[in-house]
Amino acid sequence: MSIITTAFALSLLATTAFAVPPETPRIELQAERGLGDQSYAPWQVDCPSNVTWIRNATTGLGTGERAYIEAREKLVQPAIEQMMAARGLETPPRTPVIGVALAGGGYRAMLTGLGGIMGMMNESTEASQSETGGWLDGVSYWSGLSGGSWATGSFMSNGGQLPTTLLENLWNIDSNLVFPDDGKLSFYTNLYTETNAKSDLGFPVQITDIWGLAIGSHVLPEPYQLSNTPNLTFSSLPSVVAALGNASLPMPIIVAADRKRREAGELVIAENATVWEFTPYEFGSWAFGSQYKSPGAFTPIEYLGTSVDDGSPNGTCWKGFDQLSFVMGTSATLFNGAFLELNGTDSGLLTNLITAFLADLGEDQADISRIPNSFSNYNSGENPIYNLTYITLVDAGETNQNIPLEPLLVPTRDVDAIVAFDSSYDSDYIWPNGTALRTTYERAKILAEHENTRVLMPEVPSMNGFVNGGYNSRPTFFGCNDTTTPVIIYIPSYPWSFAANTSTYQLSYENNEANEMLLNGMRSLTLNHSVPTWPTCFACALTDRSFMYTSENRSTTCQECFDTWCWAGDDNTTEPANYEPVINSVPPWLIANNLSIGMADAPGSNESTAGTASSGAAKMGVGMGMVALTAGLGLML
């Protein structure tokens, strides 16, 4: 009997006074689900003979991704033509490759990022009226990290429904992620049943598994939530979700980073750590290593968990390791701390389960996700992970690259423009200050030293420069005249209509609060329909590279846009004052440049909150988030 099983059995005995037996014992559950191929646990399959188990990153795009992007382009092209015509702009001579990147930051990031996405959806009446709705149909790639990965997984698995529709009909984010309002026992016993089944097969199980299943039970389609059959794998999405099967949605990418152990035993999450990608087709990285970079590699994600040695399976193959909930949990291991806080609190069902995990793993392994190393003994001369049993992954936001730009910056993907949604907790009052972009730029300089591991990141100002220049309060274009890089359209969160600077650790939101978060995120992209020229300038930035424009041949309209919205290269590095934007206000830069028609003339404004400083909301948000977390921990069963 495993240590997890023993602890769980003891905790059940301690709670029988008010507990009821699990509704479905493990044996019955397996019978219900055939041979286990529909549960969270991986299942054994015959090893295929026609699979390329390792693909070197220097070979370009994988076949699955290439086919998807080719199919996507057929839908993207007419969508972009329509959006350009609506602005009176010329159709690009080639179809631009556009990406969106959603930052991390818990539910705050999920809601703010999906709000920004909603600002690009023609299904949103307000976005359509703001004349930015419809651009999502022109996007080829979508990357998400941590809370942004929850947005990615939920949006994609639900077929691209309007986020406000998901909030109304599916999400149960008003119930705490760790401490649900009701059904606690069934929730925790289901967590045990599913994770123990995976452990029984010899696969590593960690708090990430519990955390991922909890996330999935709040935002994934109901048939795949913990109370039903939590068996939705990332690789199955194109088969299960029609909108992904026919390439009607951008190709999703979820990001994590690796953690290394130095010789002295110190655990390290370096800013130049390896960035790992999960897509419906592959798992891998474009560049391996930290201090020394070498070309990376990819393996079919469908067979992740299979023991592979130098590119060949060791006789037994598996499917089902790539559960979407697990991938989302892996991208957000920072939140394992929500469960770690249970250690040492009042005895309870989940407390004993977590304690068992810690005893089995060691506390230095509690905030990680372990992936069986498919690249064992592959390219051992250059591959720095060739001798590892597991790839150890953490929340990529812990590298300070809190916007997952890197997958969209690799030369192979030929991305022309990236809409970067930033809801990071950078400042004292939980607003972004450009740290994510600056960190990626500094990392790009390191990668540039190695020809096969480059990322094409334009220069951006320092964090102080972001704040002093007001770039963290309104959209800014970066890389405008550096034609070797994509144009980055930076969309920072701003309190257009709501105090969206809530705590990263706020683990539940009332529906009306979540709705306001979505709307505010949308208005950070649409500028609350207060800048008449913005829809045209947004279109210019998204398509600029496909015209091969420079300042010498850009259209008059688009050059005027770039003169207005592009970073001019200034970088005021002096220490700025605390950034404290006012709720329901217009960013001062828009007013100073006579761009805004004023909030009173814009739709959707909420005048009742005008003049409220966001600092109070931030303090209250942090307090409420931590109170909700610690109170729930104290009241555990």
UniProtKB/Swiss-Prot annotation:
- Glycosylation sites (chain numbering): 50, 56, 122, 231, 246, 272, 314, 343, 387, 433, 481, 501, 528, 553, 572, 594, 606
* Covalent S-S links between cysteines: none
Give the Pfam families listed for this entry.
Answer: PLA2_B (PF01735)
- The enzyme's main class, written as a single word, is hydrolase
Q: Which Gene3D superfamilies match?
A: Cytosolic phospholipase A2 catalytic domain
- Which keywords does the record carry? Glycoprotein, Hydrolase, Lipid degradation, Lipid metabolism, Secreted, Signal
Q: What is this protein called?
A: Phospholipase B
